[in-house]
Structures are given as C-alpha cells and as structure tokens.
Amino acid sequence: MKVVTLKDIPNVPMEGAERIEGYTGPVSRSRQTIIQPGDSANYNCSVVNFSQRCTTGWHTHNCDQVLVVTSGSGMVANEHEQREINAGDVVHIKAGERHWHGAKADSTMGHITITAFGSQATHG
C-alpha cells in the first residue's frame, strides 16, 4: 500500500498544451504522477493541471479514461456535446471516443486521469 499527498508530488511541465478557440496567449499544463511507471501492472494515474484557457486538444485513447476533477472548473467535449466540469465531478470516456478536456477561460483546472497501463493516446 502507498499513500501520497498531492501537494507533495512534483509538478512536471508537459508538452501538448492547446489553447481554447479564439485565444492567442500562453498556456501550460503539468503532470503529477501518482502511480509511478512500473508500480502497477494495470493502471496509469496522474494529476494533470491546466492553466486558464488550456486544453489537451482533440485526442483518443485505446482504453477507457476516467477523469476526477480535483480543482477549478473546466470543459470536456466529444464530437456531439461539450460539458462544464467542476471539482468533484467524475467523467468516463470510452475507448476510441474522440474528445478534449481542459480549463475554462476564467479558471485553472486539475484532474486525476486514470487509464490502462500500456495504453496509448493519439492526438488529432
């Protein structure tokens, strides 16, 4: 068993930050790895933190993805709908579903992401 406190996990900058439509300023996102590579045969689990107006851009996963919003407010969208998400919300995205998620224009957002170990994301 392992217990971690989110504030104690290093925040590592990530590439691939996308702007919300119509915004041209800087955006950033970072990752706090909860389950270290090799510590689980089944899951990847991290916190991803988004600056205001930052999204993942469109992508798919070859496994289901679960998001647990830990702070702030954001949006999640697929090709059919866009929904606001807030701290405490949980999102289930099916394998192969084209989607994006990120912070709103007026808020940062953090979420825990859970995917299958060895799974892949494809952007675009």
How would you describe each model-predicted region?
Residues 56-58, 76-77, 98-105:
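Short beta-strand His + acidic residue motifs that chelate non-heme Fe in jelly-roll/DSBH
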Residues 80-96:
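Short acidic-glycine-tyrosine-enriched beta hairpin
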Residues 92, 106-124:
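A short hydrophobic beta-strand segment most commonly corresponding to one strand
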